[in-house]
Curated annotation (Swiss-Prot):
This is GTPase Obg. Signal peptide: none annotated. Residues 169-349 form the OBG-type G domain. GO terms for cellular component: cytoplasm. The gene is obg. It comes from Bifidobacterium longum subsp. infantis (strain ATCC 15697 / DSM 20088 / JCM 1222 / NCTC 11817 / S12). An essential GTPase which binds GTP, GDP and possibly (p)ppGpp with moderate affinity, with high nucleotide exchange rates and a fairly low GTP hydrolysis rate. Plays a role in control of the cell cycle, stress response, ribosome biogenesis and in those bacteria that undergo differentiation, in morphogenesis control. The keyword Magnesium applies. Residues 478-509, 528-563 are annotated as: Disordered.
Amino acid sequence: MSDFVDRVTVHVKGGDGGNGSAGIRREKYKPLAGPNGGNGGDGGSVVFVADRNATSLLDYRFMPHRVAGSGTMGLGDNKDGSKGEDLILPVPCGTVVFEARGEQGKAKHPGAQLADLRHEGDRCVVAQGGAGGLGNIALANKTRRAPGFALLGELGEERDVILELKSIADVALVGFPSAGKSSLIAAMSSAKPKIADYPFTTLVPNLGVVIAGDSRYTIADVPGLIPGASEGKGLGLEFLRHIERTEIIAHVIDCATLEPDRDPMSDYHALENELALYADKLELPLGAIPIPERPRIVILNKIDVPEAKELAEFVRPEFERLGLKVFEISTASHEGLKELNFALSALVHEMREEVANREQAEEEARVVIKPLETKGRRPRRADEGGSALEFTVERRELGNGEVFFEVRGVKPERWVMQTNFDNDEAVGYLADRLAKLGVEDELRRKGAHPGDEVRIGRGARMVEFDWDPTISAGAEMLDGSNLGARGKDLRLEEQDPRTHRRSNAERRAQYHEMMDARAAVRDAMMAERKAGHWADPTVDDDRHDENSLFGHGESSEDGETEE
């Protein structure tokens, strides 16, 4: 079994975000000192990276399911959860990543192109990790000082992608089966492809590195092509894509073939026709030269056979009239290989400069819009960009006449995933967010009535409930005597004088209050003095006062005290 695999379907999943914590800080003499739950950690992402040390996609055929690490849950004492580890997957340079399309359980076909990893170090995030849920300390504000809930972590992105390897070489050897392409690459480089005297010996592309003086370049031996290859005949479409990256196309023509209706010129035109048909279906990468515009050379092979050498000398002027460079070689005797080697080296050098100039010009012409950086939070995915219409509400009707309302949008669907429906306060918080966004108003405009079924999202992440626009998210959702607005626990407002440290403002207020009380007492005493209460110390208005000037006992009529 060959270890060369150039197309696989991979199921990838980003790590889930960790849940936030709804912790409460505890201090001496104060068991409820406020929220201190930390945020959950973000989930890791699945990233493909072009690596020159990778040569095949074989590993992904036997291990097609790849999952990144999940974030951990937040903890009390304001401790955030750790971030999940990104899953870095190396792929060969020249790998193209496509979105997989097709029904579940059936073979997938390539959809939209996600990335073209042509150069060493090129990266593509194919499955974004979920954001960690916020802890209750992050949800607290002036009006919600003690949230009794936290947000759940988001699920990581999950999808199928198709990886296609398109070999990166400077020169592509194309020709009919048994034209001598594998023998040529073996003679010019250290590659050791399988060589035999029957068609379609080469079943996978072979790459060889050729050295010409101080320069080097790579040659790709593409499996043999036949008429109809652009439509999938033979091994056509399976390997035609390997010439998309090459800068030079070299036609290897067998001048010693004994097949009827075969001659060098007809072989050349048949191959060019297949290349032209295939080129119409291509979407070229940045800086690539269209296949019809790429330089061609013609290699007339097997001239060690006398009849083949005569045929090569006969057809050479016809190729030259087409403006093509022609080389007569023999892979058996190595005749003409040195001239071919240095001619290809010079042509490769010219094409590398032209491709580099094209890439630079096209790169300058592109407008690149980069998202804003987020502080310590998971970056947004490409499908999460904000828009004027952040959600939609549609009235749907089932076949049995039942009606429901479907809410779609990035924010509502994310909020639903973040909500713990076992916590009434969290459900009330979700209701507030949806109402503030305008979902309830839009439901009324669409004709929704209390008790109607509402669905938010689709698929496995859909949430279904009966709409109740009068649901209270206020104090009645809290049990016990410590009633207040949602997210406010009156027990947290109590201050223990043994542990509470007064601020300067509180000290000043208490000082002024004490001084005002003293001033009021002095004013009252002065008023009594002016009224004459202090003129005769023997006079007491209240004879029943035990603390009067007469002391204990009863007073006589003349004011003397009886013992």
